[in-house]
Structure formats: structure tokens, C-alpha cells
């Protein structure tokens, strides 16, 4: 070919980027970077035409795992394709998938809560699980309380004694009214109580000198054992009475014997 031949006009779009990276006439031209989804270069995609990508083969052609893949559909238009939206994997709950594999799918809150899901409308899933867990704990406590308070089967009920007594009046025995009376102690009981309650007194603790000074001796009180003649005793008593009477009237004084005497000096008999 002749060197003076006119060169082909550069192509625009993705084809221009591919031809610029080849070892053709435009090898000196810098590759035009193409922006992919989320600001990533299209050179990291599957259609990269860089010398490094051509040298290493198909290893660099596949997109890395940590970068979202961009799909470029070949088209005849020169306009760049719109940036594809990032595909979100996983559940709608927002859980991120693990690198090793897809996580086990969790049951929706409606399956966990069951029939009570209607009362949790408008509540987040985490709050719904917490409320359901609290309801389970409350029901478990109530079940434990019911088992403790429940009666044991097989035990006979003992009827009340009051009802049996009211039904059968023949078993009731009439009793006298109970009247509480205070018992009065007698003298003997009081003396016994005083004997045991009072402290013991000894004669040695009492001074009897004042009492013995006034009293007579036992010798003065003693009398001779002489038989009494009732006639003589009565005569002496009558003469003493007459003497006191005459003395009061101013008559003769009675004698020592206490009797009255006549003119001859003989005692006069007293007539009773």
C-alpha cells in the first residue's frame, strides 16, 4: 500500500475504543475510557480491548466478583448505552448475601406471628419478632402458673362439717349455756395462800420485852385447886352487894367478911 493513501476516519463509540487498543494504525492513540455503571471503567468489563487484556487472554475478560457486572449489548448506533442499574440480590428485607453462597431464606413475619400478624401492621419486622417473642414468654409463664394452680385429679372433696350438722338435726345434742363465773375463795384457801405467799417469820426477830413487862407472871395467875361450895359463894356475893348498897346510903360499914351482923355480932343470913 502507498503511504500517501488517505487514512480512514476514526470511528466513534465503543468500536473506536476497540480499534484504538489494537496494534493497527491507531496504536499510538490513547484509549478512550468508557464509564460503566456506578462510575466504573468499561475496560474492566467483558469487552475491554486493552493490550494487557489481550495479552493475558480471557482471564481478565470476566468481571471480578466484588464489582457489579455491566452488560453491553452490541448495537449499530454510535450513542453509548445507558448505565445499567445495579441488580440487588437477596430478600426485600435488606439482608446482604454472603460471598460463600446464598443465605437461608427466613420465613416472612406473617408465618412467624401466625394469626396475630394483623395487630402488627405498620411495625418493622424486627419489632414484630420482639413482640412475638415477648408474647411467647408470657404464654409460657401463664402455662406454668396454670399447671401449679390446677387441681389434682382423683382427690375426693371433703364436705364441710357445718353442712352435715345442719342436715341431720338428730346428731345435735342440747347443751346448757356456758356462763362464766368467778370462783370466790374461802377462808381456808386464803389462809393457805397467805401461808405460802408471806415470808417465814421467826420469833427471834421480834422484841417481846415490852409485852412481857406489862403481863403478869405465871405464878400470880395460878390458883389453888379447892372445891367450891355454891351456897357459900352465893352468900358472899349477896353480902358484898348489900354492903355496897348500905355504904352508898350512909349506913354501917360492912365487915371484912362482907356480911351483915346483928346486935349480938352474929352474921345475919341474907334472904334471896
From Swiss-Prot:
Keywords: Cilium biogenesis/degradation
Annotated segments matching region Disordered: 1-138, 244-272
Biased composition annotated in UniProt, kind: Gly residues: 36-51
GO CC field: intraciliary transport particle A
InterPro entries per record: IFT43
Pfam family, one: IFT43
UniProt-listed GO biological process terms: cell projection organization
Compositionally biased spans, kind Basic and acidic residues: 126-138
PANTHER family xrefs: INTRAFLAGELLAR TRANSPORT PROTEIN 43 HOMOLOG (PTHR33724:SF1)
Subunit structure, as described in the record: Component of the IFT complex A (IFT-A) complex.
Function: As a component of IFT complex A (IFT-A), a complex required for retrograde ciliary transport and entry into cilia of G protein-coupled receptors (GPCRs), it is involved in ciliogenesis. Involved in retrograde ciliary transport along microtubules from the ciliary tip to the base.
Protein name per Swiss-Prot or TrEMBL: Intraflagellar transport protein 43
